[in-house]
Amino acid sequence: MQEIFNRIFRDNKSIYTLSENNKRVYGEKIIRKKNSYLREWDPRRSKLAAAILKGFKHANFDKKLNILYLGASTGTTVSHLSDICISGRLYAVELSYDSFVKLYSLSQARNNIFPILEDANLVERYKFFVEKCDFIYQDIAQRNQVQIFNQNADIFKPRSAILIIKIKAISSKEPEKKILKETISSIRKYNIKEIIDLRPYDIGNYLVYMER
């Protein structure tokens, strides 16, 4: 077992996050490590885990990082970022009430997760909840996903960000590479540092890492 990034460990084809919490979030394997735990990070349940296993180089997240997570769903990836950014805050925005109920339950067991039941299109409604944002992570399957990202980035001005580009949500007719190129060209005020095709874990989705 080797630590490959801050609080992220790898053992052959599996990766884990170092956690102070031994409660399972989605049925993942947990290994005891002295006074802490290692939670297995499933690449088929988390696009960030898939990207790391595909060689993503910018996953050394600071433990004090404050993250605005757009499209948090039930909190699978949020929970692992909570392990990593143990001294930071995760502002997790989710619109679906059913998903939010599980996300809220997760936040009750982790004091660095702040769930927000809101539409990420309507940043004016939740911007006052977010005290500080160093990083945006967005995973939203909507046609206007880049517009959502640009609106939030203009308000919060994080130094760096991850955008999951969901090709089929934008168009199911145009060639994938054409959509990817056009989508990336629509991102404002950021320099693209890394693009990861998430195959075979996730078909038709790309992780884009960028910095100001």
UniProtKB/Swiss-Prot annotation:
EC top class named in words: transferase
Keyword Transferase found: yes
GO biological processes: box C/D sno(s)RNA 3'-end processing; tRNA processing
EC number: 2.1.1.-
Gene Ontology molecular function: any one: RNA binding
Top-rank taxon, per record: Archaea
Residue sites binding S-adenosyl-L-methionine per the record: T76, T77, E94, L95, D119, A120, D139, I140, A141, Q142
Keywords carried by this UniProt record: Methyltransferase, RNA-binding, rRNA processing, Transferase, tRNA processing
Pfam families associated with the record: Fibrillarin
InterPro entries for this protein: Fibrillarin, SAM-dependent_MTases_sf
SMART domains linked: Fibrillarin
Self-association state and partner proteins as the record states: Interacts with nop5. Component of box C/D small ribonucleoprotein (sRNP) particles that contain rpl7ae, FlpA and nop5, plus a guide RNA.
Function: Involved in pre-rRNA and tRNA processing. Utilizes the methyl donor S-adenosyl-L-methionine to catalyze the site-specific 2'-hydroxyl methylation of ribose moieties in rRNA and tRNA. Site specificity is provided by a guide RNA that base pairs with the substrate. Methylation occurs at a characteristic distance from the sequence involved in base pairing with the guide RNA.
HAMAP family documented for this protein: RNA_methyltransf_FlpA
Family indicated by similarity: Belongs to the methyltransferase superfamily. Fibrillarin family.
PANTHER family xrefs: FIBRILLARIN, RRNA 2-O-METHYLTRANSFERASE FIBRILLARIN
NCBIfam families, per the entry: PRK04266.1-2
Protein name: Fibrillarin-like rRNA/tRNA 2'-O-methyltransferase
Organism encoding this protein: Picrophilus torridus (strain ATCC 700027 / DSM 9790 / JCM 10055 / NBRC 100828 / KAW 2/3)
